[in-house]
């Protein structure tokens, strides 16, 4: 049984990475497509990544992208390797895509810190899986229907 789980993890990460290579590098598209495909193959893929100690989740009604970008640049300027979803999408699939881009085939993330911009609607389903060490809430307004 354990071999099947390991193969599923490896296969979903491999296919996600290949999708990232084809869609992202060759066609310059697909900010979330690799994550969508990997998630379809393995609904628990977020559990399969070995994240660094510092995982920062940025959420809120507005200002998430700017805050994430500023934080990532600060960490980079301090010499840290940073994994973050910088392609403009803040859904679960985009977080998975950024992890696929910055991890080895065994799921170990090759960064010192992860900073994830995430839509406030997805935070509840993502937090238990990535277990952020820090959470930044930019603001809370009623800008979208529940």
Where is each model-derived feature located?
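Phosphate-binding loop of NTP-binding sites
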Residues: 2-146
């Amino acid at each position: 049984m354990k071999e099947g789980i390991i193969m599923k993890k490896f296969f979903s990460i491999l296919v996600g990475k290949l999708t990232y290579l084809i869609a992202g590098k060759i066609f310059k598209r697909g900010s979330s497509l690799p994550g969508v495909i990997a998630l379809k193959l393995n609904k628990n893929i977020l559990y399969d990544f070995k994240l660094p100690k510092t995982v920062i989740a940025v959420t809120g009604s507005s200002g998430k992208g700017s805050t994430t970008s500023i934080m990532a640049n600060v960490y980079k300027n301090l010499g840290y390797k940073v994994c973050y979803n910088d392609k403009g999408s803040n859904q679960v699939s985009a977080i998975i895509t950024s992890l696929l881009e910055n991890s080895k085939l065994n799921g170990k993330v090759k960064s010192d810190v992860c900073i994830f911009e995430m839509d406030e609607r997805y935070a509840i389903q993502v937090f238990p899986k990535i277990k952020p060490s820090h959470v930044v809430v930019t603001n809370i307004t009623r800008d979208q229907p529940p």
